[in-house]
């Protein structure tokens, strides 16, 4: 009976293959539990507590996720598309299997401090004043992203592709840049600390 109750409890908290559209989760918060292969379209989660919720193979499209709390939240193979994601402390997430990608998202003032997020794709996104300090971004790609004011310090940027991104400032002396890719037109972002003038 004890095991039966445990099984029932786990099943109750597990949701799969469900599509949530135009839901206001500010008024009715998302139930704690595990979500697998679910899609969230045009939902409002702003300021909500995602702590200890597990998302696997899920997609968020045109959602407002600004200032959500993600303490021990699991994101495994999760895609965010055209989402508003201001001020999220991704460094609080469950590190096990942490894997996500961002396309067309606003991630301003968010933090990935000390996270290990290799092979992450950031595409067509704004990352204004985002904290990547001591983050492992190796083999990631920033495709057509605005990185104004973002912090790269003791960051592993090996094999990261910055070629189509802009407004970044990266000190080669304080970051690992082996085989990272940059475009000639934006490479001056590696020379900011030297206080030299470069004519385009």
Set out the residue ranges of the language-model regions.
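Tandem repeat scaffolds
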Residues: 5, 10-200
């Amino acid at each position: 009976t004890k095991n039966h109750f445990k099984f029932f409890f786990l099943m109750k908290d597990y949701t799969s293959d469900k599509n949530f559209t135009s839901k206001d989760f500010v008024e009715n918060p998302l139930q704690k539990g595990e979500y697998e292969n679910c899609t969230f379209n045009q939902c409002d989660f702003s300021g909500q507590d995602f702590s200890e919720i597990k998302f696997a193979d899920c997609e968020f499209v045109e959602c407002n996720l600004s200032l959500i709390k993600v303490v021990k939240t699991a994101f495994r193979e999760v895609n965010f598309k055209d989402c508003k994601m201001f001020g999220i402390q991704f460094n609080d997430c469950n590190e096990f299997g942490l894997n996500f990608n961002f396309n067309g998202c606003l991630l301003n003032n968010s933090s990935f401090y000390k996270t290990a997020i290799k092979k992450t794709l950031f595409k067509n996104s704004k990352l204004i004043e985002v904290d990547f300090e001591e983050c492992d971004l190796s083999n990631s790609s920033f495709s057509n992203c605005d990185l104004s004011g973002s912090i790269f310090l003791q960051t592993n940027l090996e094999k990261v592709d910055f070629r189509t991104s802009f407004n970044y400032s990266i000190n080669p002396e304080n970051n690992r840049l082996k085989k990272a890719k940059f475009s000639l037109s934006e490479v001056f972002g590696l020379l900011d600390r030297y206080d030299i003038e470069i004519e385009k």
